[in-house]
Amino acid sequence: MQTLRREAARPYVPSGTLEASFPAPLYSDDYLSLEGPRWPLVIRQATRWKYTPMGRDAAGQLWYTGLTNSDTREAWYNLPLDPASPFREAYNRWHGCYQRREHTMPSAYTQHLRETAWHDPIIPAQYQVPSTRWGSTLWKDRPIRGKEYVINRNRYGVEPLWRASDYVPSLSAPQRPPGTTQNYREWGLEPYCPSTCQRPLPSSTPMPR
């Protein structure tokens, strides 16, 4: 009891009871530097910088939030206009790292590499305006052999012209494979060989119902 009274009469608070490390304020331009290899996998995945190579973590890049900046062009979701701007440091490092590999890769793989590196999970995939934007860049589909596109990816709430699969563009309804219709009740239950386009001969024994 005497100990508690002496501690209560002290004019100061013991440092052991105070929180010494405070988190960064929400509306602040202070940048935190953490050592990458010590991060847990989940934190390292969540705090990966925006303009970085796929599978790498950028270090020492300024990432403006756009909340306290007077110039909105410096925000993290906008691309700077000047290529020599210091805010493009990580992008220039990414482009220099993958420029040699892009020349040796097919165009489809280069397209996929840029998609995954520039993907912004904060912005949704569909928009209510015809101009599709992927991240902060205007996106235009290019026909790449072997890659499937959604025909109404830039049309929010627009139904396709036919009631069939809408993930293979420019393919008429009769030419569609039997398993691509949206209504599973319309799928054929007979086995079908896509390579020969033949169906098995009807068996003589009736099938039980």
UniProtKB/Swiss-Prot annotation:
Intracellular or extracellular location(s): Cytoplasm, Cytoskeleton, Cilium axoneme; Cytoplasm, Cytoskeleton, Flagellum axoneme
Recorded GO CC terms: axonemal A tubule inner sheath; axonemal microtubule; sperm flagellum
GO biological process per UniProt: flagellated sperm motility
UniProt key word Cytoplasm: yes
Top-level taxon in the UniProt lineage: Eukaryota
UniProt keyword list: Cell projection, Cilium, Cytoplasm, Cytoskeleton, Flagellum
Function text: Microtubule inner protein (MIP) part of the dynein-decorated doublet microtubules (DMTs) in cilia axoneme, which is required for motile cilia beating. Located at the center of the tektin bundle where may function to recruit tektins or stabilize the bundle.
PANTHER family: HYPOTHETICAL PROTEIN LOC690617 (PTHR31254), TEKTIN BUNDLE-INTERACTING PROTEIN 1 (PTHR31254:SF1)
Subunit record text: Microtubule inner protein component of sperm flagellar doublet microtubules.
The protein, known as: Tektin bundle-interacting protein 1
Organism of derivation: Macaca fascicularis (Crab-eating macaque)
Gene: TEKTIP1
